[in-house]
Curated annotation (Swiss-Prot):
EC supergroup of this enzyme: ligase
Enzyme Commission numbers on file: 6.1.1.19
Protein name as annotated: Arginine--tRNA ligase
Intervals of motif 'HIGH' region: 130-140
Transcription recorded as keyword: no
Annotated localization: Cytoplasm
Reaction equation(s) it catalyzes: tRNA(Arg) + L-arginine + ATP = L-arginyl-tRNA(Arg) + AMP + diphosphate
Main localization (coarse): cytoplasm
Assembly with partners or alone: Monomer.
GO CC annotation: cytoplasm
């Protein structure tokens, strides 16, 4: 239990003891305490006096006074109590308890903020999963940044997380990729008799793949058409996935599993799932096609599994894939989809229900659109290539840290304008610069302290930490673990970036309000230890969203 929860629990226990001591109730109802909206009204407040009115048969202000008179303020860490309005009790804490967070943060280091106990739940988080037919773009970048941050947050909160990328390597788009490579391959060999497919891929990368294969694998020209197409499908996916994996690795995004759609066919899982759904009575034949009765589970219409020409819809392998996720022992399935997949939510959830799997185990987040902005105008095309701007170009333009940070600053269900000019600014207007500068500033102060012979470990008396800004800063440090818990519970990566901004802001306010290195050696030791705790917290929070914490800027 983190220090904030410990203090709240102690306060509740002492209020209950006070009610007993005052003889106000034999059975005490739930005591709820909350943080007042206005900090002038204390650290915590409760309405328990009004709740007890009928039980105690007394005026709520009298009840409140009785609770106050019988409260052990020392045990409850309370220095002042006010009774407000009809009987609210406002508690002002003796915030010295907060200093206990300093040695805790220093001792735990890069594990500070992490929950010690496992949740005992396996989470499979699938994100990005872009088709291996071209470059990653800004939508994929947002998916990668949010997905990776969410995986870090869930891990810190005690979940067993598997990060997975689903490779769509079995559909028509891969056939079109193979045909496109085939055309460029023969062109490189001087044979222009092959034409690009109608939905082919015309990018420069396909030309380069064709040239490379013509040089390294010229014997493919002698394969039968069927064997050649199969080889180009395989090689095309390999080339594209190597490029995607490289870009994602540079974007500080890593996966535990790369799951191939083709493997579902090779292992017979699609036929297995189809047979199971038929056996359970959820499929039927109509208009020469095979349908899944998803309307039984709140979908707006039934869905086709096998078209009347005998080919599978995309939905069937998706069902098999999600059933495979369940079979692997995952308790929670989280999918991060692009904005164009909104219509998939109900049908996927319904498909799980056909197997008797609670659809609440599947959580789908939709990543809304991102607009790249420069000088107040939307930038749709690359000045260099004339094509859509790629993840690679974004990394080259603003850097990985800025891209990762900006793309996790907003809830994924909201549209977002990515200001590339702001992301490059070295000023406090740039959120990521502001946060990283706080870390660098702390490192600079710690270096000065060390030069003066003051080590972080030297502090053991924190009673000198009394400045209001210092107390607010410590409250923010103590709030790190609860913030992680909240971000994990709500699957909300942007809660961490919001926290980082608040923590950096509180540090800068403290720095501007009071000298860290003073003539008072004991106070200086306490300050040095405190800002080391802040540095650790800031570094851990930045790492959670995939951003570095520089020691100098």
């Amino acid at each position: 239990m983190n220090i904030i929860d410990q203090v709240k629990q102690t306060l509740v226990e002492e209020i209950a003891a006070s009610i007993n001591k005052a003889g106000l109730a034999d059975e005490i109802p739930d005591i709820k305490i909350e943080v007042p909206k206005d900090t002038k009204n204390g650290d915590y407040a409760t309405n328990i006096a009004m709740v007890l009115t009928k039980i105690a048969k007394r005026n709520p202000r009298e009840i409140a006074q009785a609770i106050v008179d019988n409260l052990d303020t020392e045990k409850a860490h309370v220095k002042q109590i006010d009774i407000a309005g009809p009987g609210f009790i406002n508690f002002y804490l003796d915030n010295q308890y907060l200093t206990a967070i300093i040695p805790e943060a220093i001792e735990k280091g890069d594990q500070f903020g992490y929950v010690n106990e496992s949740k005992g739940q396996n989470v499979l988080l699938e994100y990005v999963s872009a088709n291996p037919t071209g470059d990653l773009h800004i939508g994929h970048a947002r998916n990668a940044a949010v997905g990776d941050a969410l995986a870090n947050i869930l891990t810190a909160a005690g979940y067993n997380v598997t990060r997975e990328y689903y490779i769509n390597d079995a559909g028509n788009q891969i056939t079109n990729l193979a045909r496109s490579i085939e055309t460029r391959f023969f062109e490189a060999l001087g044979d222009n008799s092959y034409s690009m497919p109608e939905d082919g891929y015309n990018g420069k990368d396909i030309i380069e793949i064709g040239k490379d294969l013509a040089e390294k694998r010229p014997e493919i020209k002698d394969y039968s058409e069927e064997a050649r197409l199969k080889e180009f499908r395989k090689l095309g996916v390999e080339y594209e996935m190597a490029k995607l994996k490289n870009d994602l690795a540079e974007f500080n995004t890593h996966f535990d599993n790369w799951f191939s759609e083709t493997s579902l066919y090779e292992k017979g899982e699609i036929l297995e799932v189809l047979a199971k759904m038929k056996e359970l009575g959820y499929t039927y034949e109509a208009d020469g096609a095979t349908w899944l009765r998803t309307t039984d589970f709140k979908d707006d219409k039934d869905r086709v599994l096998i078209k009347n020409d005998g080919t599978y819809t995309y939905f069937l392998p998706d069902i098999a894939y999600h059933f495979d996720k369940v079979k692997r022992g995952n308790d929670i399935l989280i999918d991060l989809f692009g904005a164009d997949h909104h219509g998939y939510i109900n049908r996927l959830k319904a498909s799980l229900e056909t197997f008797g799997v609670d659809s609440n185990r599947l959580e789908i987040q939709i990543m809304q659109m991102v607009r790249l902005m420069e000088n107040g105008k939307e930038v749709k095309m690359s000045k260099r290539t004339g094509n859509a701007i790629t993840l690679r170009e974004i990394m080259d333009e603003v850097g990985v840290d800025a891209a990762r940070y900006f793309l996790t600053m907003r809830s994924p269900d909201s549209h977002f304008d990515f200001d590339m000019e702001l992301a490059k600014e070295q000023s406090q207007d740039n959120p990521v610069y502001y946060a990283q500068y706080a870390h660098a500033r702390i490192c600079s102060i710690l270096k000065q302290a060390k030069e003066q012979g003051i080590e972080v470990a030297a502090a053991n008396d924190f009673t000198t930490i009394t400045n209001e800004k210092a107390i607010e800063l410590l409250k923010k440090v103590a709030d790190f673990e609860p913030t992680i818990e909240s971000a994990a519970e709500h699957r909300s990566a942007h809660r961490i970036t919001n926290y980082i901004q608040d923590l950096a802001s509180h540090f800068h306010k403290f720095y501007n309000a009071e000298k860290v290195l003073t003539d008072d050696i004991e106070k200086t030791k306490a300050h040095v230890a405190m800002i080391e705790a802040v540095r650790i917290t800031l570094k851990n929070a930045l790492a959670m969203v995939g951003v570095s914490a520089p020691e100098s800027m």
